[in-house]
């Protein structure tokens, strides 16, 4: 098998290899294999690397087009995780040196503390059908995940990086921007994938900021933000009534605005105010 792989990778391009279906993209896993090495290298180069971590986890490596460039980096140690058993066996033959750093499993169920003793970074051409779940797992483990560079549907990437006041700004924008600096790096056309997705994709970078905990009740913050955007056309006086009775609200200016008009700092201040009103 090893000699066969050496022959294949020395003779054929990525596009030809994928067409030969060594690893078949599976619709139920949301797989769209990147075929452009130039873009793959650009994604890996977007991982800044800092003295805060020396380990990187790639999610959904497929046939290893990103992994090839990751393994050339000497500033960190690379781990791979793929839920697809076919990809796992392919990668196990391609990168025998990885050993137990190649994981056949579900990223969403992965216990980070069991694998990484210290902080680390995440990178990947992420399955589009679980994009939001991946981002919320990163949020839940923000004490561990220092940096993330990832490919998402363009619409999801825009929502992550959207500023307040824009139509893309929403729940995901606020939660991520509360703890991370978000950068929209570049757009990727459908033709660079096999099979090509129906929409454009985009690469974003998350860099954790200095905020460890918000200066408010974080559980209430999440409730207020969700309530605000679940009825984004209404003023917060109406939307936040899902969290607290209207008769407890005062004439604070935030109650007369819509959720999309508030920055993260505004939502923190609103949460503090709501908390005081609820306790009164």
Feature map (PLM): residue ranges:
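C-terminal lobe and adjacent flexible extensions of AdoMet/dcAdoMet transferase-like proteins
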Residues: 208, 227-280
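Catalytic cores of RNA-modifying enzymes
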Residues: 4-227, 265-272, 280
């Amino acid at each position: 098998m090893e000699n066969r792989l050496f022959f294949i990778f020395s003779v054929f391009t990525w596009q030809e290899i994928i067409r030969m279906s060594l690893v078949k993209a599976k619709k139920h896993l949301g797989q769209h294999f990147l075929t452009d090495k130039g873009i793959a290298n650009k994604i890996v180069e977007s991982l800044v690397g800092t003295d805060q971590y020396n380990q990187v986890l790639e999610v959904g490596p497929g046939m290893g087009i990103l992994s090839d460039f990751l393994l050339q980096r000497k500033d960190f140690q690379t781990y791979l995780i793929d839920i697809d058993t076919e990809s796992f066996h392919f990668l196990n033959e391609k990168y025998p040196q990885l050993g137990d750093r190649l994981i056949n499993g579900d990223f969403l169920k992965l216990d980070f503390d069991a694998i990484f003793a210290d902080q680390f970074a995440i990178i990947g051409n992420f399955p589009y059908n679980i994009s939001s779940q991946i981002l919320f797992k990163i949020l839940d483990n923000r004490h561990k995940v220092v940096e993330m560079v990832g490919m998402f549907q363009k619409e999801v990437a825009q929502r992550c990086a959207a500023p307040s006041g824009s139509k893309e700004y929403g729940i995901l924008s606020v939660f991520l921007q509360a703890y991370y600096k978000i950068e929209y790096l570049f757009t990727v056309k459908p033709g660079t994938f096999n099979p090509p997705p129906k929409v454009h994709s985009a690469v974003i970078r998350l860099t954790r900021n200095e905020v460890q905990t918000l200066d408010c009740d974080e559980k209430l913050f999440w409730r207020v933000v969700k309530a605000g955007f679940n009825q984004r056309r209404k003023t917060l006086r109406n939307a936040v009534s899902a969290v607290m009775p209207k008769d407890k609200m005062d004439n604070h200016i935030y109650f007369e605005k819509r959720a999309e008009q508030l920055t993260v700092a505004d939502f923190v201040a609103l949460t503090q105010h709501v908390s005081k009103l609820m306790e009164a």
